[in-house]
Amino acid sequence: MQQVEGRNCLPAEVRIGLETLKRRRLERMRLTAQNNAGDGPPVPARSGGDALRTPANCGVRLHANNGTALPSRTTQNKDPFAKRRVDKFDMSSLEWIDKIEECPVYYPTKEEFEDPIGYIQKIAPVASKYGICKIVSPVSASVPAGVVLMKEQPGFKFMTRVQPLRLAKWAEDDTVTFFMSERKYTFRDYEKMANKVFAKKYSSASCLPAKYVEEEFWREIAFGKMDFVEYACDVDGSAFSSSPHDQLGKSNWNLKNFSRLSNSVLRLLQTPIPGVTDPMLYIGMLFSMFAWHVEDHYLYSINYHHCGAFKTWYGIPGDAAPGFEKVASQFVYNKDILVGEGEDAAFDVLLGKTTMFPPNVLLDHNVPVYKAVQKPGEFVITFPRSYHAGFSHGFNCGEAVNFAISDWFPLGSVASRRYALLNRTPLLAHEELLCRSAVLLSHKLLNSDPKSLNKSEHPHSQRCLKSCFVQLMRFQRNTRGLLAKMGSQIHYKPKTYPNLSCSMCRRDCYITHVLCGCNFDPVCLHHEQELRSCPCKSNQVVYVREDIQELEALSRKFEKDICLDKEISGFDSYKQAEKNEPFFEITRNLRNTEVNLIEDAFSGATAADAAKSSPATSTLTSFAQHDVPVLAEAIVCANQADQLYSTTEQTISSPLVKGTDAVGANSSSMADANNGTGSCNASAVEYSGNSDSESEIFRVKRRSGVSVKPASDAKTSNLSDQQVLRRLKKVRPEIQQHNKRPEDYGHCSVPSGRMSMKNLNSSSSCGEEHWRMKRRQLETQQDESSYSAKQKSYSYPSTSYSFRGEFVEMSRDAAAEVRPKRLKIRLPSSSTNRVVEQGSSGQRFTRDDKSLGCWPAI
């Protein structure tokens, strides 16, 4: 919510502005001294009487219409306060003011007023279509804001920002910057200064009609004589009284406690953020403005008007935000100040919160604009991704804070992506916030009555949270699986480990981060291409939270609770936003890819052709490409996987998974194998066709049993395909290559080794593939007699994890149905007794003999 930077490393325009202020101050002091020394009565300066006799009222000097000529300027730089004609903004007529519709106004009862967030959720389906709304409080504050700031908070002072009162061309040589003044005010001093400016401008101390002041503001900013105003924005503090007798102060609408309410998402943040979780004060004067901006991370905001003159707001609905950014990039900003192209470039400049232009520019390009005139005792709510701007009608004091409820997560994900693309440091750890909210919701679902839960957690908000969490876990599983196929090692990090930021895009790495030999800074999973092209693939270490299996189990539960088709494409108040943002296309593209692949596979089409025919319009769906080979393999072994999944579904979610399924290797890439960049070692891909969870086909699970094969039994794996074929013909001469039956694929697992899309298409490759499967079946049959003995003779090394015992029991239970293969390879002695276990899914887990899964120091 902060609008400008401090005075460290001031830009040239700011320095020029301060020099201009200093020259004007010295000139006025010289004129005052001359007038006081003359024979006649002193002539007061136009900046206002006694204000010049005390340096305390420098604000009056800033806003005065000084008719005295300044010394000629020697600098070639333009005066940052001088008004210029801006042809792109037609201000010759203000008739467009009457075309702006009013936003809705709500009058809650005292009973409804007791639950702020519940009431906001109630009005959101309608109010969010306007971007902003007003709520008139049924309870008034008994202690005025001035008393709170002067009596309850003695010594309260604040600095102001100087705002040039003009329009800008928004070109390289003409922009607007708000900068800090060199003055600290008390609340009373600022009020006196602001009232003097108002009285001098209109010869009145009373409020003027709202429409008249609105017209005056746009005339002044385009043609007027006022150079600049002062605005105290982003001032730490609150004007809500701590008195137990103040009805509003002790209510839930006290903004000091608003973000910490029971159903507020931001209460899960461990560190307070000024302006986001803690409120800030906004103390304004005549024509002080807040420029067009959207809240950080597309959060909700609530603003309470404590006292003073009215305040006019302009709001844009959240679903019209792309149109707003498009208009700004094409009709407000010149190309020379935009870094990049499109709406993201305009969004980057808008984050500076200094862009002010008349709303008629938006109306002319069919972007809806709504208006609110806020009075003392009224709240203004801005909804996620709603751009807004406004100005004050005179001295006033407001207070604002951000908040979020679960239906914010979809747009919060979009904001997180945009910050990463622009390399902006986020204020919130979005991934952590999403995971914590999902875990908390699961506890509520287990321990609360459904009726009482619906009152505290709106069903729509629940669906938004569940959908976003499932999307996050899908992406994590896909990318971790791909890295595991490349040979990356998996380690666990404790829950208490700090949440790191990605060194490339600044996202938070709450669940997973990657370290490699050539880059000792953490990298998040969103940089898959960079990780794949890294020369030290085998030296990459993927660090995963030790409670990853709890999150995976929760994701599977949420998948069963909701239908992603309906939720991702049907957010009630954000349908238009979905059409304009790639975030909402993630699941749609995954879903289309899945359907096309299944249909084409059963009709004989290749997986590559299906991938070409599926839509790929979003850069965010790059991880969907890794699902293509998984789907092809899943279709081949669907029957066996159905049987396996039904047998071991409950066991998979046991602590066993915590030890070996942490990477969720469901994103095996055949393209990598084809290019020689990775190997596909998955020997079992599970597909639950009967499950109501649509993402089961994306999951590659480790086989539920284990078998240690002696070296003598594994010799055949070193033979060439032709040798294997000849031996098979000797053993079973009735088998011929042309007698391959399609149903054979329903009773075998995909063989280990390198695979590619070409192998699925070539008839000769299919024949070799068939014989490899037959060979595996024969090996399995030969091992059946000795399987039980091998199971009993297998000894597990000591470990700090408790899942080994459950692992043995589960293996024995599943031995009748599954004959898995797990290789245990002991590296040379130079590896300091480290054992590498490679599972059937191709994942590599490194453990030390002394401490399995320990977290290495970084």
From Swiss-Prot:
- The broad enzyme category this protein falls into is oxidoreductase
> What cofactor does its activity depend on?
Fe(2+)
Q: What is its EC number?
A: 1.14.11.66
Catalysed reaction, written as an equation: N(6),N(6),N(6)-trimethyl-L-lysyl(9)-[histone H3] + 2 2-oxoglutarate + 2 O2 = N(6)-methyl-L-lysyl(9)-[histone H3] + 2 formaldehyde + 2 succinate + 2 CO2
State the Gene Ontology BP annotations: chromatin remodeling; flower morphogenesis; regulation of gene expression; transcription initiation-coupled chromatin remodeling
Ranges of Polar residues composition bias in the record: 829-844
> Which residue stretches belong to region Disordered?
737-791, 829-858
Designated name of the protein: Lysine-specific demethylase JMJ706
